[in-house]
Amino acid sequence: MRDKKLLRIALRYRAIYLDIDPKEIDLETKPTPAVLAFVARLRENGFSVNEDLLHALCMVSATELADITAVIDDVMGVKLNWATLVKGWNVPTGKTRADHLITFFANLIGGAKVGLEGCTLPCGCFIPEGTFPLERYTGCPFCGTPFTTANFVYKGQASKLKELRLFTEEDLKQVYQSLLASPTPLDATQKDSFEKLIDIYGLPDNVEISMKETAMLAVKHLVANGQQAQAQALLKTPTDILRYLWYEKTGYVQIIEPRTLIAQARRFYYHMFGPLNQSEYAGKEMKKKLKLKYDRKHCQCVASWINNLALSPQQATENMNAKRGMWVRMIRALRLGEYSRRKGYEHLADILDAFYRQEQPTWLGILQQARNNRDTQTVLQMLKQRPGLFARSLFATMLRFGCEETMEAFEQVTDQMPSRLLLSLGNAAEKYFDPDATRTVHPITGYTISIPKNKLLSLYSPADLRAMVARVKQCYILSLKHSFAAQATKARTIYIAPSLFDIPISVGDRSATIQDTSCALMGTRFPVEGDAVRLFLQWGKGLHAQPLDMDISCHIAFENGKTEDCAYYRLKATGAKHGGDIRAIPDMVGTAEYIELSLPELAEAGAKYVTFTANAYSCGALSPNLVVGWMNSAYPMKVSEKTGVAYDPSCVQHMVRISESNLSRGLVFGVLDVDEREITWLEMPFISQNIQGCDFTAVNALLQRLRNKLSIGQLLEIKAEAQHLSLAPSPDEADEAYTYEWALNPAEVSALLNM
């Protein structure tokens, strides 16, 4: 079990984990028949091996190779059901809305019971003669229930293989250390890897974890192993304690207030068809779920944590005020008032006394009063006391109090800020100071909203706004150069892979899906080979047979402003074909939907962009373990004439899995640029039962923001200039080599900003 967990983590970094000593690898060894057979199986799944891994495989037994094959098959979903509703769905069935309407009324009046000619299917639906061509379906064309499953997938149709490398115990420990030290919040893939690694390796002594959310995962591990006292070192403020308690209650490492979660539950379970709408019931159930109830052991643990905080009562109170309403509930539920009267809990008593008296003015209150009084000097002096808050309010402060004065004060404290914060300012400046741009935000509750521009922008001329953007960019580039120059290095040459110039730095773009076969950063561009892109959606793995309707769709935007959708309600669109709408899942093996895009047809029709989406039509969020992605090959990809299976793991270019903590009902997962023949991987959640509820203005805004962000390659060029490094033509000739494989670990990329 341990090795299987480590193998799954290694696959995310395009590697295979082997429990061997790399020093014992014999590079002269010839591959055994078992190794050659294993490599052939890897090719069927779209993978190849480099030379080091090939020789390393000779050191493991055939049984271990079989176990590795089983894990890779499971990750790629080879044993699941990939049949869809229509046989040979690349040829349209010719069904119409009239077929659905006639079938609806035929079932309404009794079907065969009243003498109508037709066929009654196992699901109970009556299909009148002359409507749906039943010989073309694997299930019911009216209610979407599948009757048959498939136990095969196509293999080996890929034109390009993904090379795997060797990972040993030392490599995985380095991954673990990079996650512990990550200066940016972990995305869903990193979080899943971290939880597995901390269970295997434990938490190192005297570890420093810079990210609060990562610290909560570590605290959870310590508490689960009865090490509550050791967890105290990671809980330095009352907010840290509240964050852990709320994570324990809800499963989210961010503090999401109860009213937000209740409103979110109502949105998730809203259904456009009234009888299926469960929004009110879901809201009541969420309210019950969030009720606080703790046993005595838990209460004493939290009381000790607060009592042992190194903060003064006034500092602790100010920290608690931001979530005062939640703290009032927690204090009552945890019986902290009772514990504060016990001997040894005097510090807890002082904190609660200061919290309830509210006698001391808060820092934020004083700052807001100075803002209201337009006291520029006081505002800037106070913001310099908290550089992080200064950075987050920099743009609004520039508009309100003037660019020059604000930037002069800001530049005095830039050396106290992490580079990732300055980088995010540089990436956001152009969009913020553009009066005509669409600004989008992605709340942690799983949807995307557009926000209005700052009204103060109208007070400045275009030249003034451009000057503000230039000043911000100049500030962060100079700061980055200064930070890189301050680093001691013995290197004289550097290699930067060309592909890194197409991958933006992931600061501010945290993925909520799990990537089991790679760790592509949001904004990564994938070139399209061949003339077809095949989208796929697989859901229902591990679930019993039940109605569960997930949908895959695409939105086609043409140069003339026209748009078309290819979805369950329109199976044939310009340059796109849908495999049929399934609304129920078979037992344990799931089911699948597909869309095939023809690039020649799209180009001929003048299509510019195609946006890929997945939605939960059923009440609730996207199903956990749902897998979505796309296939691509220079060679034609087959479609089964018997079951509609169109999945080939070797052709998968990118795929993601929905995590258990998913908070979205819809997901935009890619945009195809028809002219450039490339797909941009992005992740934009939204709340809607189908693609018609997606805000494509927000999608375009996100796409442009990703393309305008500083790329990894550009950041490395700044590093090379600051440290006077010359560019090397290959990794072997460089003192420092930054390859695509290195970029597969987002924590390593983020480490560049941890200065």
Residue spans for each PLM region:
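Intrinsic-disorder/low-complexity signal
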Residues: 1-755
